[in-house]
């Protein structure tokens, strides 16, 4: 019997020396707990995804140097399989990819073997074919007379029996089975979307049972730009039963035992999963906000508090991620702000224990109005004047953030961002859009969940009609359909890629569907200039959304 440790790590992209130290620490801890073999996530040495850092030769050189340092620092009694980038030295032909996405085996202070990723994803947020060469097949190493097959992330996602179709021509897992492996490990950096860990476990359990081989899956954890990695590393036996699992959204070192006589895995820990999707989503957003600030060098956040539900939720997330003393809320009431909204904002801040400052914007609005009289003359009050209020607020928030070194959190939700119900250089200002991938209906669900044990979000915030309060008596439904209808349409259009006619056939009014489709298309220029938003659904308006701005395509049925 030998013991395998799964190091579920939270690397910082480009912090190569720091990441190497983290791996050494994990190895020493694993050795102290009796482990013989340590597994890290995909590209653990540089962090995933490194993107165009890979085009910098010095980045790759530093990775090579740190890999050698890592080998020298490894305890001699433990072997390690570490995810990193390695040069493709045979890539001499001009234009051929010169890098591998690799797993490197280190034993007794020596680099013994290299394993390269076969399947390179190019969908959604992935663009690996831009940088890496694709290996012809997966390979194995022998450890204590056990053939251990090595795969990297996507290599396990081509089980045609599970999906009902093949996505790639080769199946690395099947290649390893044909080579007679006894155990398969997978080094992964699989980004989070709500409920995705269930899909991973279902897929890998199915594959283990299909091929009668135990499988180990070790995932990255932490936030890197718009992506959140949820961890949840796990192992299954040859019958497809999960026998060990690390917790979601935190670093972990889990141990497994491999029985040489039975050829089976046994686990020492089976972490429970969140009871509801809302709890899981909350944990993801908290991790994403905290890591984004810390990895960008910020310790404090600022946001505008309007008394509405979106800013209330973002404030609660920020306080949980950073601590109440590190979050500042700014109230900026205008002549159109209701008294109850001001009181709701103050009540929220009191419930969270965070500090606030109030800056009435009426005098600034008057100055703008006076300056624009020669141009606007007698034109009636309209959208330009409404947006000026938002831009005044955005300007004030950026000034305060700039003055004190805080990061400004944008508070817009996915529903608003989709249809452009937001103001460029106004409420869209910020360094991070915390809930930009959370639909409005889910914002309400999160706030109700937060209030399950004690009142954090003031009850009136949950019951009053949503409003931007940029003119007298304004409510969101003056411009948009009810949010349950809007989110139903957007979910089908954005995440399920349905055509307007398919959405209409699902029971939505034709006129409403066509209006929403048009708004989504016309608002691309706003999304292109938005702050980075944390991805929590299968399709976000982030790095995986690549729509043109100047375009005239209209789907059939529209």
From Swiss-Prot:
The residues that hold ATP are 304-311, 411
Give the UniProt record's GO annotations in the biological process aspect: NAD biosynthetic process
Q: Which residues form the active site?
A: 42 (proton acceptor), 117 (for glutaminase activity), 153 (nucleophile)
Gene3D superfamilies (UniProt xref): Carbon-nitrogen hydrolase, HUPs
Task: Give the family from UniProt.
Answer: In the C-terminal section; belongs to the NAD synthetase family.
* Function (record text): Catalyzes the ATP-dependent amidation of deamido-NAD to form NAD. Uses L-glutamine as a nitrogen source.
Task: Return the protein name.
Answer: Glutamine-dependent NAD(+) synthetase
> To which species is this protein native?
Synechocystis sp. (strain ATCC 27184 / PCC 6803 / Kazusa)
The gene from which this protein is expressed is: nadE
């Amino acid at each position: 019997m030998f013991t395998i440790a799964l190091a579920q790590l939270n690397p910082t992209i480009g912090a190569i020396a720091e990441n190497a130290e983290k791996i050494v620490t994990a190895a020493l801890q694993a050795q102290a707990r009796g482990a013989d073999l340590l597994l890290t996530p995909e590209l653990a040495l540089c962090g995933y995804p490194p993107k165009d850092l890979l085009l910098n030769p010095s980045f790759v050189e530093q990775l090579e140097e740190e890999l050698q340092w890592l080998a020298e620092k490894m305890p001699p009694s433990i072997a390690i399989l570490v995810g990193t980038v390695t040069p493709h030295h045979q890539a001499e032909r001009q234009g051929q990819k010169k890098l591998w996405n690799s797993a490197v085996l280190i034993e007794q202070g020596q680099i013994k073997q290299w394993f390269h990723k076969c399947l390179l994803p190019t969908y959604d947020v992935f663009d690996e074919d831009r940088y890496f060469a694709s290996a012809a097949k997966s390979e194995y190493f022998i450890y204590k007379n056990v053939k251990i097959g090595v795969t990297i992330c996507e290599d396990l996602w081509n089980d045609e029996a599970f999906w009902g179709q093949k996505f790639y021509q080769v199946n690395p897992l099947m290649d390893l089975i044909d080579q007679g492996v006894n155990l398969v490990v997978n080094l992964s950096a699989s980004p989070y979307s709500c409920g995705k860990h269930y899909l991973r476990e279902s897929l890998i359990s199915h594959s283990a049972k299909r091929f009668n081989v135990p499988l180990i899956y070790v995932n990255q954890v932490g936030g890197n730009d718009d992506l959140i990695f949820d961890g949840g590393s796990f192992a299954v036996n040859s019958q497809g039963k999960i026998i060990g699992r690390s917790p979601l959204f935190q670093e972990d070192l889990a141990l497994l035992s491999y029985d040489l006589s039975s050829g089976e895995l046994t686990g020492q820990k089976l972490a429970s999963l969140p009871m509801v999707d809302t709890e899981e989503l909350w944990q993801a957003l908290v991790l994403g906000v905290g890591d984004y600030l810390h990895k960008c060098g910020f310790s404090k956040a600022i946001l505008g508090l309007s008394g509405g539900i979106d800013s209330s939720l973002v404030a609660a997330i920020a306080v949980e991620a950073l601590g109440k003393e590190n979050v500042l809320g700014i109230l900026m009431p205008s002549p159109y702000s209701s008294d109850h909204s001001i009181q709701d904002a103050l009540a929220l801040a009191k419930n969270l224990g965070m500090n606030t400052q109030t800056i009435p914007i009426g005098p600034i609005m008057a100055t703008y109005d006076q300056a624009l009289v020669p141009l606007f003359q007698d034109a009636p009050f309209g959208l330009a004047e409404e947006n000026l209020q938002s831009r005044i607020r955005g300007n004030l928030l950026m000034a305060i953030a700039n003055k004190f070194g805080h990061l400004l959190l944008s508070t817009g939700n996915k529903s608003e961002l989709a249809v452009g119900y937001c103001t460029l250089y106004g409420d869209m200002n910020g360094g991070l859009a915390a809930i930009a991938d959370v639909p409005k209906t889910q914002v309400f669900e999160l706030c109700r969940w937060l209030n399950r044990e004690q009142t954090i979000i003031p009850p009136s915030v949950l019951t009053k009609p949503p409003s931007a309060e940029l003119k007298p008596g304004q409510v969101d439904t003056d411009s948009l359909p009810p949010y349950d209808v809007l989110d139903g349409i957007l979910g089908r259009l954005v995440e399920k890629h349905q055509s307007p006619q398919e959405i209409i056939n699902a029971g939505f009014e034709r006129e409403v569907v066509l209006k929403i489709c048009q708004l989504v298309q016309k608002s691309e220029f706003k999304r292109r200039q938005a702050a980075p938003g944390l991805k929590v659904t299968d399709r976000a308006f982030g790095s995986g959304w690549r729509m043109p701005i100047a375009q005239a395509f209209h789907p059939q049925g529209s």
